[in-house]
Amino acid sequence: MLERQRPLTPPIAETSSYPVQIPEAQRSLFRQVLALFEQKKVSYAVAGALALQEHTGIHRDTKDLDAFLTPENAALALRYLRQEGFDCEVCDPVWLYKAHRGVFYVDLITGMSNAVIVVEDSWISRAQPAVVHGTPTRVLAAEELLVSKLFVTRHERFDGADIAHMVYAVGNRLDWPRVFELVGEHWELLLWALIFFRYVYPGETHCVPTEVWQSLIVRFQDVIGRADPHTRFRGSLIDDKMFAVDVKDWGKENLLLEYRLRRLKTIPDVR
């Protein structure tokens, strides 16, 4: 009997410092969307692969344009895109709306899927000028882009390499107090990401200021020294599928559900 072969997973594109060839139809669509947002005065910032490229020089093939907006501005953007004939959908009201034509699409992102991190006006006001596909626009500041990737830790997608590349490229110029402000009580994820960076780039430890390392390590030693066995389980905030057994079978708390329900109560209606 022939052994059944497992289906092949789609190949993952390699990162490169050389520009990727983008179909003109895709460029045109992205330019149209950015021009529409400018015309309608929708406050946004480009994120994703295009923002990563701006901060690190790394090019990656992508069929989508990621735009970060506050929930209120995402609702406006979706309305304007519908008026322009885009097919629009609310994928997840907590964080993601999509507008597409053919195989190319725009992601309107208002936060992280676990609802821990939410895009606020300050994210947009701190965005920096850039030119994307020949169009003057703004990309997320490095601090916000880095923090937006901290919770992308799922089994099927991990943004640790992006974070490591960002720290390598701009770590010495980062506004670290702003990073600490954004991560708040989830600072241990930042420590985890920086230890990952240190493993990848052991000779570039200086990209993270000594006082940042010391601050995080002292805080970590403090919480380890007074560990509370009643501290709530946070695995579902990382990956609800991989930690489903903890919640469903072992009776651990479902913080993901709590965060998302709390967030849903504050989201504007999008029609």
For every predicted segment, state its role:
Residues 1-271:
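Compositionally biased terminal segments of proteins
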